[in-house]
Every structure is written in C-alpha cells, then in structure tokens.
Amino acid sequence: MIKNDTIAAIATPPGEGSIAIVRISGPEAIQITDKIFSGSVPSFASHTAHLGIVNHKDRQIDQVLLLIMRAPRSFTGEDVIELQCHGGYFSCSQILEALVSEGARPALPGEFSQRAFLNGKIDLIQAEAIQNIIAADNLDAFFIAQNHFQGHFSKKIQLISSLIVESLAFIEVLADFPEEEQPDMDVPKQRLNEAMLIIEDLISSFDEGQRLAQGTSIVLAGHPNVGKSSLLNALTNKNRAIVTDIPGTTRDILEENWTLQGKRIRLIDSAGQRETDNLVEQEGIERAISAMEQSEGILWVMDATQPPPSLPEILFQKPSLLLWNKSDLASPPQLDTSLPQLAISAKTGEGIFELKQFIQKWMQQQQLGKNAKVFLVSSRHHTILQQMRSYLLSAKEGLLAQLPPELIALELRQALQATGNLSGSEVNETILGEIFSRFCIGK
C-alpha cells in the first residue's frame, strides 16, 4: 500500500495572504525541486532554510524560502521540501505546475497525512486528530483534537491492548497445555477488569466530548414578550430573531452559534411559557421545556416593568441566571431566591457586558479539571470501543462460567483486533481511503 512516487500540493488555503506554501514529499522530492530552484538542493543539510529563486522554462516565477527535511526526520517520514512563496493564487500555482511538470504527482486529499501514517510517524487516531484540529471552530474542539494528536488517547488504547494480550497469554496456556498445572485465573480477570475500567471511562466521555466540541447549549427562556429574542439579537449582534410586541411570536426553537472568548455556545431562543389554547404555540412551549431539560444552562428572562413571576423548578436543577430585561424602563425588583440575578436592557445594551462576563465565568467553572482528560468525539471511536467492551464482557463471563479456553480466546482476539481498528494497524485500505479523503489537499 505504501506508494513510492513523489507528491506535491499547495498546503495553504487559496486566496490573498502574505505567504503561500507548496509542499513536496517522496523519494524524488530533492531531485525534482533541484530542477527548479536556484541553489544546489542535494547539498542542503536537513532542517535548514535557504533563500532562492524558482525558475521554470526560462522564466523566473518567484523568490522563495526553501525548507528541507530529509527522511526519516519529517512529517511523512520521506524527504520533504516546503517552498514558501508570496501569497495569492498565481505564485504557488505556478510553482506547483513546475514541480508536476518535472515529475511530481498532484497529491490527493490527506495524502501527506496518509503517508505519515503508513510510514509509522503517526497512528490513525493522531491522523484523524489532524483533520479535527484544522476543522475546529472553537477552543474546546481544538484542545480535544490536540490532546488526541499528542498521543494521550493512543496511549490508553496501547494500555488496553497490552492488558488484553497479557490476559490472552494466560488463556492460550489453558488451550495449548490442558494437561499441565493451570495458571492462576485471577490474573487475567484482574487485567480484563483494568481494561474495562479504561474503556468505560472513554465511552462515558463521548456525550461530554460531543457537547464540548459542538458547543455549550444555553437556553433563553421565560414568559412571552419579555425580550428573549431581543436578547438573542443583542448577544450575537445579528437580527436573527423576529422581534415584535405581540406575545407568542416565537413558536419554535431558534438556535444560533455564538463564540465567546474562543468558546462555542449554542444560544437557543425558545417559545414563551404561558397557558394557551393554540396548538402550534403549545408545541413550541413543549419544545422549549425539552430544550431547557437538555441544556447546560438557562437564562431566564423577565420583564423589569412587570411584577415578579413564579420560577419553574428546572431553574434550580441546573446552572441558571435570572435576567431582568427592560431595566432602562424601570428598576427591577429583587426576587427572594438563591439564584443569581442581573439587570439588563437588550434595547440599550445595559448589562450585556456583565452578562457576557457571567457566562464566561460560568463556562470556566464547568471546564475545571477537564483540560487533561481524554474525550471521545468520533462516532467511529465510540462504536469500536462499544464493540470492544462487548467482547471483553463475553470473555469475563466465559471465565466465570469456565467455558472452553478456545471460546474465551476468540473473544479476546476480537477485542484485540478492535484496538487495531482504532490505531489503524488492522484497518483495510477502503476504510483508510474513506478517512483520509475527508482531509484537505496539502495535508
């Protein structure tokens, strides 16, 4: 499966910018680049930079900075050269065209990362993390992906694998030498229990990992016509929600992604809570209640010009903040409650800065102790770990029931293969192709 040709691609996004990078990797990377670069590329030491001119067909294309990384001390494990040229479309595209005309092949999406995987520089978990780092649209998603790329998830899988191998060795002694004195079965039982604890911890992190990667959900709730939609617009600086003086205007869930200090938040505007005979509005209210139940926090909006309303019980079951909107029209009353309260005006902007500070502190408190934890965010990883758990549970039950060792060994081998499906050592070409095809060209 390892390819021996030399590939090239533009590694930076298209469009205007100060610099662009053209990357080339493979056994002929140095020789091909030498044909278009003004210096003697074969004489350059690894991990050095050289200023020069790219020429092709008697035409000077651009002045570039050449970085050379000789195999195996490179990202792909092959000879790699990066040419840093002026930004924009034409310089990098002309350099790529020159490299291809001299023998390089245009790289496929993710092919540089795929070569790094095939050459043992990274495992499949780390390769997938590269794409997640690139695609991250908030800090939580970025740091989860960085955690995977740094190998923390892979180390857990390696530990699980070693525990399974140790258990399997004991079981295979039973199968191969049934007449001999039997080893102590407490050892494989203990090793399987240790592996199961790690697997359960990883599986249980999936929902939280998804939430962190996709963003914290905060619901704007309250009675009709208190300014929930106006607040959504004020926080996001968009006219996203329809604002009228007619109660019950919002009848469905309206969600808007919002980034606050690098943290992604899913702000959810919901239907006003009241008694109504309108079936459509009733459905909206039911959806609002469901959204509050599933959210990580609630902003309960109230009208400062109206008497204090009763508070629903759900506000005391999860992080909640009481907001007295329209404080530009009246001084808000103070409710006798343990919940924090804040006066704001979605119309004038009063209190919005303080509200953002409160939400930021809120999220920092939720984040405590999570930075070093490995979170699952991939459905592929989650599914394989569930399969692994099933195999190990069957093996444990087989040990307790004293089933034939061959049957127990079969379950352990399947669990061991599942660890290979995660790391990539047991993955076929079709799956690898599907995974790396999601990458951008040049990575």
From Swiss-Prot:
GO terms for cellular component: cytosol. K(+) binds at N225, T244, I246, T249. Keywords: Cytoplasm, GTP-binding, Hydrolase, Magnesium, Metal-binding, Nucleotide-binding, Potassium, tRNA processing. It is an enzyme of class 3 (hydrolase). It is found in: Cytoplasm. Binds 1 potassium ion per subunit. Mg(2+) binds at S229, T250. Its cofactor is K(+). (6S)-5-formyl-5,6,7,8-tetrahydrofolate binds at R23, E82, K121, K443. GTP binds at residues 225-230, 244-250, 269-272. Exhibits a very high intrinsic GTPase hydrolysis rate. Involved in the addition of a carboxymethylaminomethyl (cmnm) group at the wobble position (U34) of certain tRNAs, forming tRNA-cmnm(5)s(2)U34. Belongs to the TRAFAC class TrmE-Era-EngA-EngB-Septin-like GTPase superfamily. TrmE GTPase family. This is tRNA modification GTPase MnmE. It comes from Chlamydia caviae (strain ATCC VR-813 / DSM 19441 / 03DC25 / GPIC). The lineage of its organism: Bacteria, Pseudomonadati, Chlamydiota, Chlamydiia, Chlamydiales.
